[in-house]
Amino acid sequence: MLAMKDKPWLLLFGLLAALSCLASFGDAAYPYYGTKIGALTRLHHGVSGDVYAVDSRTIFIKKFNYDGEAPAAYFYVGNTARPSNEGAARLRDERGGTASLTRRYRNKDVTLSLPEGKTLRDIKWFSVWCDEFAVNFGDVSIPPNLDFPRPQKISALRGVHGVSSDNIVIVDAQTLLVPNFSYDGEAPDAKFWVGRGQRPTSDGLRIPDENGKENPLRRYERKTIVLTLPEDLTIFDIGHFGVWCEAFTVDFGHVRLPEGLNVPPSLKMLGISPQSKLNCEVLYDDLAFEVRWAVAGESIVVQLVAKLEPNHYMSFGISPNKNISQMIGADAVVAWVDPQTGNGFATDYFLEGKAQCSGGRGACPDTKISEKTNSIRLLNAAMVNGYSIVTYQRSLAATDRLDLPISITGAESVVWAIGPLNDYQEVSFHTFYNKHLHQIEFGRQPKWNCPLPEGARGNSNSSEQEDSAPAAQSSTGGAGYPPAGRPNVEPDEEFYENRAEALHRQPPQRRQETAIITQRRPVPTPKPVNSNGAWDIPAIQCHEPEDGVFYAQMGPTGGKHGYPAITGHVGWGISWYINGLLIPEIHVVRGKTYTFVVEGGNNPDIPAKYHPFYISDDPVGGYEHKREEEKKAVRIYAGVHRSRSGQVTPTGVGRLCNWTPDVEGPPADDYQSFGAYQRTLTLKCDAGEPGVITWKPDRNTPDTVYYHCFTHRYLGWKIHVHDSCDSEAGGLKGAASERHEIRLPAKATVAEPAPVHEDYAGEASVRHETKMASALLRLSRRAY
C-alpha cells in the first residue's frame, strides 16, 4: 500500500519513471511552468524575469536577467513585510552552488529549491539581494493564498482481465503514478492508452510502460508503476487513461481525467535534464556498472545498472570500515534480472565471510542468518538493451543488527562486486570487485558523474544564455546506453484529492498542434498464428435450423485449439458462439429470411461487455473503429441503422449471455475436442432482453460474408451464401444445430427499414421475449 502520508514518496516513486525518457528529452514546445507569481521588480543591475511556483518548494524564473557585476548577490526568500536580510533564507543557485551570483544571466531559465523544511506558505517574498550593501536588486511578493501546483489523486482503475489499481496520482503534467496495478497479462496486445474525450477509442495514443517499452503488457500483480507521457504530450491534452487492447480495439478499464488539474510542470517542461536531479557514479567502466541514487527523507533510493552475463549478479554495499573498502562485515544488496522472465531481485546480504552461504556463515542473505531481517524494498527491475537495471529502497538508518547506517553528512566507504549466481540463486565468489578504496558522499547535491544516456541533452534555454554548465562527455555512452530513472521535482508535503479548489483552472495555452493523433490510424493486424491442432467445429448447414433462427452469444476462444487455430488470427479471449458452437461456419440460401437472436451485451459504457452483432463483407469486424476510408470499402448487410444524417448505429444489441468455463477445470488447451470442452461451459445471462436482427440475403449478396462484433475486431467467422440448398452447394455434413422455440409478443415492434446507402443494405429489427430453458443451447446431435 502506498504510504501517501510519507513526505518523500513523490521523489521515491519518481525514480521509477520510464527508463527511456532521456532518449526523447528535448525542447519543450508549450509554455507551462506552474502557477505564475509575478514579475521581478526591476530595481538594480538589470534584474528581471517572470517567477512561477512549480510546486510547494520550487520556484522557476523564466528569462532571468542579471548583469553579474555586484560583489555579493544571492537569491533570498523571507517572511518579513518587505525584502531584508533579517530572518531571510539564502537559496542555492540553479546548480546547487552556494557562491554569490558573479556571472551574468541573460534570458536564462532558472529553477530554485527552497531550503529544507520551508514551503511557499512560509514566505512572503523572493528577491535577488546583495549582502554586502543590503540592497534589494529586484523582488516579487508571494500571495498568502497562492494556489501552487501539487500532485492530484484521481480515480482507481477497474476493468476486465483483472485490471485494477489504487487511486492514480497525477504527479506532474507528464507523469502518472499507478499504485498497486494488476493485469492478468492474457490479452495479446494490451497497452497503456490515453486520448481525448472521456472514453478510449482507437484514435488514442499508446504510452510506454514503466520501462519505456511499448510492447504488449505482461502480467502485473499489485505493482506500483510510474508512467511518462511521450514527447510533448501532457495531461492537459487528454481526457482519459487506461489499458486498451490495440489489435482488438477493446477497453480493459480506464479512468477519466478531470479538466484543469493544478499539477506541477514536468522536468522536461522546465528544460531540466533528469540526471540533474540524480546522483550517479561509475563503479566498473568495463561492464558499464553504475550506481545512481537520491535521498528521499529518511530513506535512499538506489538504482544499479550493469551489462551482466546471464545468471550473474551485481552487488553494492557499505563497508564496516570508513577508511577502507572492506568486504568482510559489509552490508550489501545483491541484485539481478532474470532475462527469461524479466523478473528482478534485490536481496539484503551480510558478508560474514568470503565463502558461499552455508549454515548462516559466509556471504548470506540476511534472512538466512536471522528471520525478518530483509531491509531492502525492490521498486523496479528491467532489461533495457542488454543492461540489467534494478531500483530499490532502504532506510538510511540501520533497521537490524545486520545492517549498517548510511551517512548523508560525510563520505562512506563502499564495496561492489559482480559474479555468478549458484544453483540456489545466491552469490558465488565474485569475478570483479573494487580492489581499492572507493568513497561516496550520499548526501551531496545531485551530481551526475556517469556517461550521459543516448539522447540526453542539457538545459534547453535560449541560445542567448551564457555560462551554462558544460555537457558531460560520454566515453562509453552511445547507442543503446541505458537511460536514467527520472525523479520528479522536489517532494511535496501533500497532494490534492480533486478538491474544488484544485479543479476548474484554465489549462495552459497550447500551440495548435498536439501529440494526440487527430486522424484515425490503421489498427495493427495481429500476427498470423499456427492453425495446426484446430478443433473440428461442425458447420451449420443451409437446411438447419428449419425456422432459420440463430442464437448469438459470447464465450471463450477455446485456447490454442479454438479461435486462433480455426481462423489463423490471434483471439483476445472471447468469440461469438452461434447456437452453442464456437464460431461455426454458417450456410444460408438467398431469398430466405433469417433471424439472429443477439445476446452480446447492451451497455456501451463497458466496452469489453458490449458486442453488437452485424454482418458484412469485411473479414475483420470492428466497424466502429475503422478509418473513414476503410468504412467506405465495407458493405454491411444486417445489424445497423443509418440515420438521415449518415450516422451508423448498431441494432444487433441485447443483454449479455456468456458461455463461462469452469474455473476449477483444466484449461481449454487440454481438451482434444470442442465437444468435450463445450460440456464444461455454463451459459450465464444478465437480466434484460435479447436483441433481434433479420436478414434476407439476395442476388447481390456475395458468396462469403462475415458475422462480427461492431465494436471489436476478430470475434466472428464466415457465412457462406448459396443459391439453393442441395448437398453440393450447402455442404451437407450432418446436423449441427437444434431447433429452438421462440415466442414473439402479439404486437412486436418492427423498426423502419434503414435507408439504403451505397455501402449499407437496409434491414428491419424487432425486440422480443424468449422462452429459453437453462439447457436451451445444447451442442448439436453430432457425436464427439
Swiss-Prot record:
One of its GO terms (biological process) is spindle assembly. Residues 287-419 form the DOMON domain. One of its GO terms (cellular component) is polytene chromosome. Keywords: Cell cycle, Cell division, Chromosome, Cytoplasm, Cytoskeleton, Meiosis, Microtubule, Mitosis, Nucleus, Repeat, Signal. Its main location: cytoplasm. It comes from the Eukaryota. Residues 34-143, 151-258 form the DM13 domain. This is Protein Skeletor, isoforms B/C. It comes from Drosophila melanogaster (Fruit fly). The lineage of its organism: Eukaryota, Metazoa, Ecdysozoa, Arthropoda, Hexapoda.
